[in-house]
A protein has these predicted regions:
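Basic, Lys/Arg-enriched alpha-helical interface segments
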Residues: 1-67, 102, 110
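Enriched for short, Lys/Arg-rich terminal
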Residues: 70-110
Length: 110
């Protein structure tokens, strides 16, 4: 069953911040390609969200959170942190894979 996707405002801000980083450190074309790839990969989460591993921070949250490695290249260098509510995949944050761990104060409750 294909679930709908909703990005929390923080996830949208993360994507914009990373897009601007790509544009500043690579090129506008590279940044737009990164955005296209990431949006496609986020959409693919909805096909089988339970196939993604629990986030390392999962135990700190009152609801289940999972990670999808995303981005250009064979191994995504970003992670989409998400949860599933009813029939919706809620993307909480989109972070660089090397960024620190999240706590409940870093995300908006879905």
């Amino acid at each position: 069953m294909l679930l709908s996707i909703r990005l929390q405002p923080e996830a949208e801000e993360d994507i914009l911040r990373n897009l601007l980083w790509w544009a500043g450190h690579h090129s506008t074309d590279e940044a737009l390609e990164w955005q296209r790839v990431v949006q496609k990969q986020i959409t693919q989460i909805s096909l089988n969200p339970d196939s993604y591993p629990l986030s390392i921070e999962n135990d700190a949250f009152p609801y289940e959170i999972r990670d999808a490695l995303i981005g250009k290249g064979k191994r995504g260098s970003y992670r989409a942190v998400f949860t599933v509510t009813d029939d919706t995949v809620v993307v909480l944050r989109v972070l660089g894979a090397s960024q620190g761990q999240l706590g409940p104060v870093d995300v908006r409750h879905p």
